[in-house]
């Protein structure tokens, strides 16, 4: 039987990094569901489509030509044969991704696509509704959080490491708080922990401490 570990949580909580580390440690496949919504947002912009037209955006989501290529310490994301790993991480694409993710037709278009990532090898799934909607029967569900201030600090460090010259902490914090509000209050698949999820606050924890806690939970459940 295929095993899936879901890790849900708000933007900037460290889901992506932790999921990659858990996948490496377990030998499981990796699903970055947030990237699918960011890819949909980017493709919508690049095609000059109307982002307010739910059916048009859903059509784009259904026909995405995407590929995830594992790299040392990261994952390369390809859209129609083009490397968009950095492009999908732009703040404006993240905000638009949150908007299009609220469309039921878009979520439905991507649902089967996400479930298809689960193979006999096992899967670590990163997102906002992995444990509640996409993989509700997962034997281990994590809801990873951190304070908005800590998540803004992490984003600032990411941008500094990427060589971004002009960084506005207050704007980044405001964007995170707006996105949290959007994600929590959308009508379809709002950002909420599954009833049986393990709540894990990473505000005062290192990446390795979070990783070890999750690996401990997985091993206690004999998932690998």
UniProtKB/Swiss-Prot annotation:
Binding residues annotated for ATP, in chain numbering: 9-17
Family: Belongs to the cytidylate kinase family. Type 1 subfamily.
Record NCBIfam families: cmk
Top EC class, one word: transferase
Reaction(s) this enzyme catalyzes, per UniProt: CMP + ATP = CDP + ADP; dCMP + ATP = dCDP + ADP
Subcellular location: Cytoplasm
Family annotation (SUPFAM superfamilies): P-loop containing nucleoside triphosphate hydrolases (SSF52540)
Protein name: Cytidylate kinase
Keyword Transcription regulation: no
A GO MF term: CMP kinase activity
GO cellular component entries: cytosol
Source taxon at top rank: Bacteria
């Amino acid at each position: 039987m295929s095993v899936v570990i879901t890790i849900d949580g708000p933007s900037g909580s460290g889901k992506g990094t932790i999921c990659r580390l858990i996948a490496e440690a377990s030998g499981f496949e990796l699903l970055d569901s947030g990237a699918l919504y960011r890819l949909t947002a980017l493709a919508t912009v690049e095609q000059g489509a109307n982002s307010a037209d739910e059916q048009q955006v859903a059509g784009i989501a259904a026909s995405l030509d995407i590929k995830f290529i594992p790299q040392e310490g990261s994952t390369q994301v390809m859209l129609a044969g083009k490397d968009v790993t950095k492009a999908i991480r732009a703040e404006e694409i993240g905000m638009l991704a949150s908007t299009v993710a609220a469309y039921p037709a878009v979520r439905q278009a991507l649902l089967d696509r996400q479930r298809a990532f689960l193979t006999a090898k096992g899967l670590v799934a990163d997102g906002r509704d992995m444990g509640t909607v996409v993989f509700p029967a997962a034997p281990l569900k994590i809801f990873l959080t951190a304070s908005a201030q800590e998540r803004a600090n992490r984003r600032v460090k990411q941008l500094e490491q990427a060589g971004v010259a002009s960084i506005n902490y207050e704007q980044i914090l405001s964007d995170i708080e707006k996105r949290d509000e959007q994600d929590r209050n959308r009508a379809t698949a709002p950002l909420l922990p599954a009833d049986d999820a393990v709540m894990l606050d990473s505000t005062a924890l290192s990446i390795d401490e979070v990783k070890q806690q999750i690996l401990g939970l997985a091993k206690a459940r004999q998932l690998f």
